[in-house]
């Protein structure tokens, strides 16, 4: 099944973990602004960063975004 990415849920996952974007930035050696861009849907997280974030806050990588099933069929596969 194909999915489209909905809204970023990083802020919600951070709140559940009792952590802040500043904490995450220090943990992963990034500027906090990068995480704010993800949270405000200005940028999409690269998979490598999403995996690191999920590991740091103890959630599944798929929990970082709303996943919207796509109705589009891929032909020729």
Question: What are the residue ranges of the model-derived segments?
Answer:
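A short, Lys/Arg-rich alpha-helix, primarily the initiator
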Residues: 1-19
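Short, basic-rich loop-to-helix N-cap that marks the start of a DNA-contacting helix
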Residues: 42-55
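Short alpha-helical "recognition helix" segments of helix-turn-helix
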Residues: 24-25, 53
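Residues in the helix-turn-helix
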Residues: 23, 34, 63
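A detector for short, charged/polar N-terminal pre-domain segments
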Residues: 1-5, 36, 72
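Recognition helix of helix-turn-helix/homeodomain-like DNA-binding domains
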Residues: 29-44
């Amino acid at each position: 099944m194909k999915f489209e990415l909905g809204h970023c849920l990083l802020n919600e996952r951070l709140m559940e973990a009792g952590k802040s974007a500043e904490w995450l930035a220090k943990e992963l050696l990034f500027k906090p602004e990068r995480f704010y861009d993800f949270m405000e849907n200005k940028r999409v997280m690269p998979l490598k960063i999403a995996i690191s974030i999920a590991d740091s806050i103890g959630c599944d990588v798929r929990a970082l975004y709303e996943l919207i099933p796509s109705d589009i069929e891929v032909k020729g596969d």
